[in-house]
Regions:
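Short, strongly hydrophobic alpha-helical membrane anchors
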Residues: 1-8, 128, 134
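Transmembrane helix-loop junctions in multipass membrane proteins, especially transporters and channels
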Residues: 26-33, 58, 82, 86, ...
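Transmembrane helix-bundle core of multi-pass membrane transporters
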Residues: 100-164
């Protein structure tokens, strides 16, 4: 049973970055925009998060850098897709390939300059919730995750509420159904 608990725990732990990407992509999907650049946003966010966290030693600044990088990539995608009326598939693929190439190039420059990124241990940031930890089966699965994991679970409910219970959500869905 501990083996199965470990698999489910790791699945939840590793699904969080993809879940956050999907939660952001829901807005584009509901507005009838096919955002192929989500992979590039994830890569830019993770690259700048690690880079800024390493440079400053502050993981919160790393999270903010990831958000900022994703916002910039999203603005580039929106500019070329909406303002310039470009093909969103081609723009998304171009962004994905460009971000991949730029991140690889910068990492090669850092390696040639003997700049090594030290990674922090994610186990240092895990939170054990006493109420959940003592539940026989669910305790080992749901307790001991990082803050961002619990935030992503809350974001699922908040985004559902925003999309289906607010005027903003109605506007986004109406624009997606009838441009």
């Amino acid at each position: 049973m501990a083996f199965l608990d470990g698999i489910i725990y790791d699945s939840i732990y590793h699904a969080v970055p993809i879940l956050l990407c999907v939660l952001g992509g829901i807005f584009a999907y509901k507005a009838n925009v096919l955002n192929i650049a989500l992979e590039g946003m994830m890569l830019a966010g993770s690259f700048f998060s690690v880079l800024i966290s390493f440079q400053t030693g502050n993981i919160v600044l790393g999270y903010l850098a990831a958000i900022g990088a994703c916002l910039v990539i999203g603005l580039i995608f929106a500019f070329f897709g909406v303002s310039c009326k470009g093909n969103v598939i081609i723009i998304g693929l171009a962004i994905n390939m460009s971000v991949t190439a730029i991140a690889g190039f910068v990492l090669q420059l850092m390696n040639s300059a003997n700049i090594r990124l030290n990674f922090t241990n994610a186990a240092d940031f895990k939170i054990n919730i006493p109420m959940i930890e003592n539940i026989p089966i669910l305790g080992s699965i749901l307790s001991g995750h990082t803050v961002i994991t619990y935030v992503s679970f809350v974001l699922i409910v908040l985004i559902w509420f925003l999309m289906y219970r607010t005027k903003f959500g109605i506007y986004v869905r109406v624009v997606g159904e009838n441009e």
